[in-house]
């Protein structure tokens, strides 16, 4: 049976990507009846759009953070040995 994507407000990017990969795998196997394949494809399109939205939101957040710290000097990350 086709899986429906969860509500966009509760699903993170990684979960969306995993669900999309599962759908792609099922479609590539070619074992689904036509109607189920169409439902999976439709869900895949929704998940792809949701993933794109998540990436755009992350990019916007990064741009805002970079603008706020425009005067701050960036330094390389130095991990601490613990």
UniProtKB/Swiss-Prot annotation:
Disulfide bonds: none annotated. It catalyses: Exonucleolytic cleavage in either 5'- to 3'- or 3'- to 5'-direction to yield nucleoside 5'-phosphates. Keywords: Cytoplasm, Exonuclease, Hydrolase, Nuclease. It comes from the Bacteria. GO terms for biological process: DNA catabolic process. Its EC number is 3.1.11.6. GO terms for cellular component: cytosol; exodeoxyribonuclease VII complex. SUPFAM superfamilies: XseB-like (SSF116842). GO terms for molecular function: exodeoxyribonuclease VII activity. It is found in: Cytoplasm. Its main location: cytoplasm. Belongs to the XseB family. Heterooligomer composed of large and small subunits. Bidirectionally degrades single-stranded DNA into large acid-insoluble oligonucleotides, which are then degraded further into small acid-soluble oligonucleotides. This is Exodeoxyribonuclease 7 small subunit.
